[in-house]
Regions:
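Accessory nucleic-acid engagement/destabilization modules that flank
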Residues: 1-199
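Conserved helicase motor
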Residues: 6-10, 291-303, 452-455, 469-486, ...
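Conserved RecA-like helicase motor core of SF1/SF2 enzymes
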Residues: 65-75, 469-482, 487-489, 497-539
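Walker A/P-loop
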Residues: 229-251
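Conserved Walker A/P-loop ATP-binding site and its immediately adjacent core
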Residues: 260-283, 293-296, 393
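Conserved strand-helix element at the start of the C-terminal RecA-like helicase core
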Residues: 262-273, 440-465
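Inter-Walker segment of RecA-like/P-loop motor cores
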Residues: 285-335
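Interdomain hinge/linker at the junction between the two RecA-like core domains of SF2 helicases
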Residues: 389-442
Length: 539
């Protein structure tokens, strides 16, 4: 009998055991279910069944039962996968299920025992590993040898997705044996969340003025568009048009119609994430929304409240109906090789992914970002929505990476809406010294100044009167920034003195409304985004 895990009591006595066959079967079932979301269930099951084949050795059993030296238990399954099934990418998933996806290396020059995948595969495999599976009552699937994937970028994304399925399944099956029920799941399903949203917006359906009528039209257009086919979409809504709730309406309806797993919002700034996540929690219930970025504290300690533990567990694999995260978190995971980063990836498949403030995608990395979006749609059955008031021109790039997937606008009356939502006039000023600019700002009771650097923002702020003046930058911790934004909104609402100097963090979707905005010269998209802070709530 070969064991995969032993549970010990505080005195070091074994109190429960899980055989290799039990662990492989449990992992394979989960991995298959995860991979079914993008049509790779057979591969998901195969890598689950083979991943811990190397535990069927005296060396590993000595390690497990008598704290012997470490042994490589991942390579055996990788060799079996490559040798008997010809599935090289699947073998990579198995080889790296603890240490991370390995560098493939060079088939001609790598030697047996090298750390590359080719080097590890050349170590060979003893037939007794497979014999041990048979002795344990396990049956390996009868699958044909895999054909090579001609597109290497597509192959890399598929490999990471399958790797994610295996890593998450392995963690979950092991966790279930070692710790029992830790409180994962228990979320409301997508149809329930859609019904909750529809109830929330029902009072809005009798607008009392022209602007609210337009907002209702946008909302209802997005809700109806949710029945459209999966694909690539843009949502171009002018400032003040209510795109946060409108995009959520599309996403939930679309997910409900197509049986999709979740809605994921990708947002450039944590200040906007905090704002939008608060809206989503208010509508859908806090237990159904995960806010995941570097500023969120996650607590898995024994004394943590159950809701905090549930949130921390959801952050490990994004197994929750609504995720609000950063572009950095998403794209770094899509191009990562570490198990902790990749674990969540399979939950991007068959999901609605909304890129809010899409104009903020980083220009130096635009091609890999767009390639990932295209792959999520074309390979992994997801729908991608680019949502902003200032839509970037990504059509050619998307067409190159996802041929045959046209990009469709969800709100086709965009041009007319911009005219009807026009609430801002622009005027170019001559260059001003810091002191002169501070003097101009001091002449107004309520004014916002946006500059291009943190250093400039600090200099100008220090020249303003202390009473009613605020300075915002990305160096602030989230709690401090949110406290300042709350004070700013309250002072604006009460008509009190409120002068704010900020970097560009405030111009992309932060919900504030100033009568006057100064914007240091920048790209046209930044200037238009700055205009969002004036006239946002007009009407």
């Amino acid at each position: 009998m070969y064991y995969a895990h032993i549970r010990w009591d505080d005195r070091g006595a074994a109190i429960a055991s899980q055989t290799v066959a039990e662990h492989l079967s449990g992992t394979a079932a989960l991995s298959r279910a995860f991979a079914e979301a993008f049509g790779a269930g057979d591969d998901g099951e195969l890598i689950g069944l083979l991943h811990d084949l190397g535990k069927c050795t005296d060396g590993f059993q000595n390690r497990l039962l008598r704290d012997g030296p470490r042994v490589d238990h991942a390579t055996a399954g990788a060799v079996a996968c490559s040798k008997y099934y010809g599935r090289f990418e699947d073998a990579a998933c198995i080889a790296g299920h603890h240490s991370g996806l390995p560098d493939f290396g060079n088939v001609r020059t790598d030697c047996a025992g090298d750390a590359t995948l080719y080097g590890r595969l050349k170590k060979g495999i003893a037939e007794k590993y497979l014999e041990s599976c048979g002795e344990s009552g396990m049956t390996l699937p009868d699958l044909p040898r895999a054909a090579a994937q001609p597109d290497r970028l597509c192959a890399s994304f598929r490999t990471r997705m399958l790797y994610s399925c295996l890593v998450d399944a392995d963690f979950l099956d092991t966790e279930h044996f070692m710790d029992g029920d830790r409180g994962r799941g228990g979320y409301d399903d997508i149809p329930t969340l859609l019904a909750r949203l529809e109830k929330y917006i029902a009072p809005w359906q009798n607008p009392q003025n022209e602007l609210n009528r337009l907002r209702c039209d946008i909302l209802n257009t997005c809700l109806e568009a949710g029945a459209k086919a999966k694909g690539l979409y843009t949502l171009t809504v002018p400032t003040g048009g209510g795109k946060t709730v409108a995009s959520l309406a599309f996403a939930l309806r679309h997910a409900a119609v197509h049986g999709m797993q979740r809605v994921i919002y990708v947002i450039p700034y944590t200040s906007i994430i905090e704002q939008n996540a608060a809206v989503f929690r208010d509508i859908l219930g806090a237990a159904n929304v995960l806010e995941h970025h570097c500023g969120v504290q996650l607590d898995l300690s024994d004394g943590a409240p159950p809701e905090e533990v549930c949130r921390a567990l959801a952050a490990e694999n994004w197994d929750i109906p609504v995720v609000v995260t950063t572009a950095v978190q998403l794209f770094e995971s899509l191009y990562a090789n570490r198990s902790s980063r990749c674990r969540k990836l399979h939950n991007l498949a068959n999901s609605v992914i909304v890129f809010d403030e899409a104009q903020m995608l980083p220009l130096p990395h635009l091609r890999p970002c767009v390639a990932a979006m295209a792959s999520l749609t074309a390979q992994f059955r997801s729908t991608v929505v680019l949502c902003t008031a200032t839509q970037p021109s990504l059509g050619d790039l998307l067409a190159a990476y996802a041929p045959g997937w046209p990009v469709e606008e969800l709100c086709p009356q965009t041009a007319a809406l911009y005219e009807r939502f026009r609430r801002v006039t622009f005027r170019r000023e001559d260059a001003l010294e810091d002191s002169a600019l501070a003097g101009r700002l001091g002449e107004h009771r309520q004014v916002l100044c946006i500059v291009n650097s943190r250093r400039a923002a600090q200099r100008i702020y220090e020249l303003l009167p202390r009473e009613g003046s605020f300075h915002l930058s990305t160096l602030m911790i989230p709690a401090q920034r949110q406290a300042f934004l709350h004070k700013i909104r309250e002072r604006l609402r009460r008509g009190e003195v409120c002068r704010v100097v900020s970097t560009s963090l405030i111009e992309a979707g932060v919900d504030v409304d100033f009568p006057l905005v100064y914007r240091e010269m920048a790209g046209l998209d930044s200037i238009l985004q700055a205009a969002e802070s004036k006239g946002r709530c007009a009407g």
